[in-house]
Amino acid sequence: MQMAQFLSLVRGDSIESPREITSPSNLISESGSNGWLIRFFDSSFFCEWIAVSYLYKHQHSGVRDYLCNRMYTLPLSGIESYLFQICYLMVHKPSPSLDKFVIDICAKSLKIALKVHWFLLAELEDSDDNEGISRIQEKCQIAATLVGEWSPLMRPHNEPSTPGSKVLNKFLSSKQKLFSLTLSPPTQKSLLFSPTSGSNLQDDGSQLSADDNKIFKRLIPSPKVRDALLFRKSADKEDEECEKDGFFKRLLRDSRGEDDEQRSNSEGFFKRLLKDNKSEEEEISNNSEGFFKRLRSSKGDEEELTSSSDGFFKRLLRDNKGDEEELGANSEGFFKKLLRDSKNEDEEPNANTEGFFKKLFHESKNEDDKVSNAVDDEEKDGFLKKLFKEKFDEKRNGNERNETDETVYTDETSGEDNGREGFFKKLFKEKFEDKPNIGKADDGNESEDDESSEFSLFRRLFRRHPEDVKTTLPSENCSNGGFVESSPGTENFFRKLFRDRDRSVEDSELFGSKKYKEKCPGSPKPQNNTPSKKPPLPNNTAAQFRKGSYHESLEFVHALCETSYDLVDIFPIEDRKTALRESIAEINSHLAQAETTGGICFPMGRGVYRVVNIPEDEYVLLNSREKVPYMICVEVLKAETPCGAKTTSTSLKLSKGGIPLANGDAFLHKPPPWAYPLSTAQEVYRNSADRMSLSTVEAIDQAMTHKSEVKLVNACLSVETHSNSNTKSVSSGVTGVLRTGLESDLEWVRLVLTADPGLRMESITDPKTPRRKEHRRVSSIVAYEEVRAAAAKGEAPPGLPLKGAGQDSSDAQPMANGGMLKAGDALSGEFWEGKRLRIRKDSIYGNLPGWDLRSIIVKSGDDCRQEHLAVQLISHFFDIFQEAGLPLWLRPYEVLVTSSYTALIETIPDTASIHSIKSRYPNITSLRDFFDAKFKENSPSFKLAQRNFVESMAGYSLVCYLLQIKDRHNGNLLMDEEGHIIHIDFGFMLSNSPGGVNFESAPFKLTRELLEVMDSDAEGLPSEFFDYFKVLCIQGFLTCRKHAERIILLVEMLQDSGFPCFKGGPRTIQNLRKRFHLSLTEEQCVSLVLSLISSSLDAWRTRQYDYYQRVLNGIR
């Protein structure tokens, strides 16, 4: 009991403050029961799947915090595979650490940020907590735009500085370079420090002027100053006081030995400040020289003055109309007015500027005797402290604007204290402090308006963070020491000036008046793994391009989806096509405009691409009863990558649970040599490494090459355990041995095919008998013709309408111009590569590097989140088969959910549905006819196409059984150019079915025309490829059982989502688990798979559903 209380106390204390687990020993010492979990997370087995699954199973904040910290080490491509589940958990199982992780990865990848936005948008439309989801969505948007780390889609072009803001642009560019230098490693030598011509180069490669070069050289800090600024994150509070002296000694050090250069620089400073014409240069030089004598007597040492202040103060203090002459003639009076104290004079709007020069060049006669005795104090509290010093007891007095346009400098009304409230007091005013109303300038005073606009932007660059104001106010009220530390010019000020990326999120303009981010208990501390990168500035061009790309990409996808939604109400079909063409033309015009704001990201596929055009003649309207999906081609350009970007070979590999994307980019491994039937084995694979034992290869080869002439075959299966020995057991019959493990005591599945002993010689089938014979079941083609004939007479079977609702009857008829299918004909009418070359030749972007063509389907009106889940599960089955080395073939595709009723779907090139193949070619009445015409019967390519068909049939049959995928008519079955079959459209799975009636009760679709391709028939006639199909189904099912929890848990995470497939409630997950038959032995599982195949052989319900689709929707 005491131990339990102690553990609970420890857990309670850990929730009070954010935690960051740096070593596993800390958590192990807190709770011994969690030690194994931490060791598991730190092992090499840790991956994206483990992270997501344990985030779902564990509610403890400590476990979640540790998992989120560990997820930072995982690749973004793997995280993107489970982004759908992560966003769902973030909404329905909230955690501060998970929120922060999602926000951080949004800052690293534009595609992830876009997908997070769309996933949250879909949840926002279904959830009651709209405010909470909107808040997270806005934070992700800020992270992706203002503090994004991803490279812009286009290289930002340097904008030329306008004549009205040369001074400000010069300062901004110098300040940005100063930030990058102070935050770069001191050991790196930049070209900017070189005295050669390389130092005169700007970012775009253009030459700097001589004045600009001097300004920049003066702003470059020494390596010691950079070292002092780099320690800001690691310094403790107790070390701040002792390090401050050294910090400002280095920052304000004297540059002795440069008196001549300083004198020339300062002399040039006031020459340009008060210059009227060339004849007055000598007089102004003498005045400025006398001024510096007074300055040196008050300070005791010389401070370096940068020439950057030349143009700045000249613009700040000059009059807008012809005041340069008056400045030249009355320069002596200017300095008298500049340096005198006037406590009883009226205060004018420009008193702040005059107060600045008073503070900057104030004569302090009382300090003449202290110059030699307090050198260190002068270095610490000298120039910059006077320059940036801030007064807290602020007085607000009304000001009046002088009616004339001839005066620039006015007299002061405030005393010595108000005189200090000058230029930099206004510059460093807090962000949330009320701004006094000084008055309005005259309409003709254009320079005053220009000055105020630039001044507000200049002050915003150095604004103080609101949290700093909150933390410094108590100390300011308590003692004067707090004022010294937090006022501008001190070390704390500079530490806050170069604040972290996380602070700049809250300081952004888009964050507005929203609440600042609260640190919730249990959230991990922010990690700063890249201190050498310069912090992003909200005003630079790269940030503007990121913001533009993010919003333009969202608008682009929204316009595509809304087009599909609006086409529903347009009739007839010709008007619908015209409207779609006009909409595409309008989107193309928007694409051209988006090029100036950063470009539009193509959100699908592997890699980062920028959308440049949509060919207007390449759209296709797809057949649908109630919706109007359409297919388009999109021209894209590969996004520009920064120099030095690492390219790894891992990008070509499929991640765990990843989806092969982007129209043929799927990296599908070739099957091992033992997967080939003996008669079709290719020579190229004979020398490759074998993945299974020799006995397994021999057994499968024997099973595949066995030509049985008996009509009925009995299958006898048994599981045997053999010790590791070199002896081989030989059976008298035809024996197939399947290896199921690699342990020392191996388990073998023995498959024996024997003829029925009751058969006589007369029962032996004649080998010359035609392969496709008629049998007791009515052929699909004959039955369909009978139904069509009855419909023509006004008769129809019960429950079937005479015509498809809303469908053109021409869909069921062969094409008028359809010819005979030949071996070289493209299934889709045109090969994808030929289409790609044709469009590239006609496109104005075709000659640009990185050009590519993508094809997508835009769909609206359906919630495609269930289809996204189905494709994700198929990708997991794909990984399971690949890891086991099995040749079962699957082709996942990408479904990108953009809302609860819209989605973008990847198209699979060079494919066509069985329905479209039969409709296009009159000579094709069955799938066997298609194979005979396409691949030439009995040719090597025909055998290879048969093998591809069997491998894909076995893979999809298991998936359809385990996930209970329904609505398997020929419109949802595709064929590719290599003979693979591909399933699409997973709107009915797990517990729902078309019409709410489970009419398709067979485990999977295995009709006669599918069996004919495997040289079998509706009775299950044994053949080489049909036996191969059985073996693959047995191997695949035994392998899937080992990963059952991986599939079940992925589905269980979303069981409360309200998807149609979960309408069965908790029984949905229970039935899914039952279909894996985890309680059966492997021998029993073999018999189970064979019984599933037998139950699916040309099942009556499956055939009747095909008849129904043919009559109702014209699907052949």
Swiss-Prot record:
Acidic residues composition bias: residue spans: 405-415
Transmembrane helix keyword on record: no
Segments of this protein annotated with the region 11 X 20 AA approximate repeats (PPC): 210-507
UniProt KW Transferase keyword: yes
Segments for region (G-loop): 836-842
Subcellular locations according to the entry: Cell membrane; Golgi apparatus, trans-Golgi network; Cytoplasmic vesicle membrane
Class of this enzyme: transferase
InterPro entries named among the record's database cross-references: ARM-type_fold, Kinase-like_dom_sf, PI3/4_kinase_cat_dom, PI3/4_kinase_cat_sf, PI3/4_kinase_CS, PI3K_accessory_dom, PI3K_accessory_sf, PI4KB-PIK1_PIK
Catalytic reactions on record: a 1,2-diacyl-sn-glycero-3-phospho-(1D-myo-inositol) + ATP = a 1,2-diacyl-sn-glycero-3-phospho-(1D-myo-inositol 4-phosphate) + ADP + H(+)
UniProt domain PI3K/PI4K catalytic: residue ranges: 830-1101
Pfam family, one: PI3_PI4_kinase
Membrane topology, as annotated: Peripheral membrane protein
Main location: membrane
Membership in a protein family: Belongs to the PI3/PI4-kinase family. Type III PI4K subfamily.
Notes concerning its domains: The PPC (Plant PI4K Charged) region is involved in membrane targeting and phospholipid binding.
Protein name: Phosphatidylinositol 4-kinase beta 2
Organism: Arabidopsis thaliana
